[in-house]
UniProtKB/Swiss-Prot annotation:
The keyword Hydrolase does not apply. Gene3D superfamilies: 2.40.50.110, 3.10.20.120. This is Exotoxin type A. Binds to major histocompatibility complex class II beta chain. This toxin is coded by bacteriophage T12. Transmembrane segments: none annotated.
Length: 250
C-alpha cells in the first residue's frame, strides 16, 4: 500500500511539472529573427551550470529502433541502452506527432536529461529527451552533405565552419554540435562568466519559416525545462537549408 502511495505521488508530481512546463514554455523557437527583448542575458544565468551540463552530456544516438511503450499520449519509450540508462523516453509536442513515430523504425539523436525524468516505477536507469526522432527509411543522403554555419559577432561575420550530415538533420543534434564547437573554440560556455551577452542559432529552411533557439536559458535554469525547446522535433533539409549564429559581447 505504501509503495502504491509513493508511486502515485511521483506520478502526480511528474504530471504537474509537465503541465507547468507546457504552459510556461522557455523562450526559444520562433519565426524570423528575435527582438533583443526576447533574448536571455548571460549575466542573469549561472553559465557554469550550462558549461558543466554540456561538457558532461552524452549525445544520444540510436538507429533503426522501435518504440515499446508510452507513459503519456505525446511520448514514446524505447528499450535502448547508453552509459547511464537502459530505457529512453522522448517527448514530442503532441499526440499526433507521437502517433507518426509510434511502432515505426526510427533514428534517435538528441540531448538527454535525468532530473525530473520519469518513465515508470521500475525504471531506475532511465533517460529522457525532447524530440530527436527521425524516420530511419528514406532519410539518408546518398552523398554526405556539409552545411556551413556562419557566425556573426556584434553584427560582423567573424567565422564559419562546416557540419557534415549523412541524413536530413534533427535540429536538436545540430544545435548541440554548434554549441559544442563554439564552446571549444569561442568560449560560448565557460566555468565562469560568459564573455557574450546574448546569443542564438537561426535555422533557415528553404520552403518554410525560419526559426531560432536561444543559447542562454532563463535564470531558473533546469535541464528538463530548457531542453523543452526541442519538443517540436524540427528537422532540416541538409541540401537546401542554412544556419546562422548571432552573438553579442558585453
Amino acid at each position: 500500500m505504501e509503495n502504491n502511495k509513493e508511486v502515485l505521488k511521483k506520478m502526480v508530481f511528474f504530471v504537474l511539472m509537465k503541465f507547468l512546463g507546457l504552459t510556461i514554455l522557455p523562450k526559444g523557437i520562433c519565426s524570423t529573427r528575435p527582438k533583443p527583448s526576447q533574448l536571455q542575458r548571460s549575466n542573469l544565468v549561472k553559465t557554469f551550470k550550462i558549461y558543466i551540463f554540456f561538457m558532461r552530456v552524452t549525445l544520444v544516438t540510436h538507429e533503426n529502433v522501435k518504440s515499446v511503450d508510452q507513459l503519456l499520449s505525446h511520448d514514446l519509450i524505447y528499450n535502448v541502452s547508453g552509459p547511464n540508462y537502459d530505457k529512453l523516453k522522448t517527448e514530442l509536442k503532441n499526440q499526433e506527432m507521437a502517433t507518426l513515430f509510434k511502432d515505426k523504425n526510427v533514428d534517435i539523436y538528441g540531448v538527454e536529461y535525468y532530473h525530473l525524468c520519469y518513465l515508470c516505477e521500475n525504471a531506475e536507469r532511465s533517460a529522457c529527451l525532447y524530440g530527436g526522432v527521425t524516420n530511419h527509411e528514406g532519410n539518408h543522403l546518398e552523398i554526405p552533405k556539409k552545411i556551413v554555419v556562419k557566425v556573426s559577432i556584434d553584427g560582423i561575420q567573424s567565422l564559419s565552419f562546416d557540419i557534415e550530415q549523412i541524413k536530413n538533420g534533427n535540429c536538436s543534434r545540430i544545435s548541440y554540435t554548434v554549441r559544442k564547437y563554439l564552446t571549444d573554440n569561442k568560449q560560448l560556455y565557460t566555468n565562469g562568466p560568459s564573455k557574450y551577452e546574448t546569443g542564438y542559432i537561426k535555422f533557415i529552411p528553404k520552403n518554410k519559416e525560419s526559426f531560432w533557439f536561444d543559447f542562454f536559458p532563463e535564470p531558473e535554469f533546469t535541464q528538463s525545462k530548457y531542453l523543452m525547446i526541442y519538443k517540436d522535433n524540427e528537422t532540416l533539409d541538409s541540401n537546401t537549408s542554412q544556419i546562422e549564429v548571432y552573438l553579442t559581447t558585453k
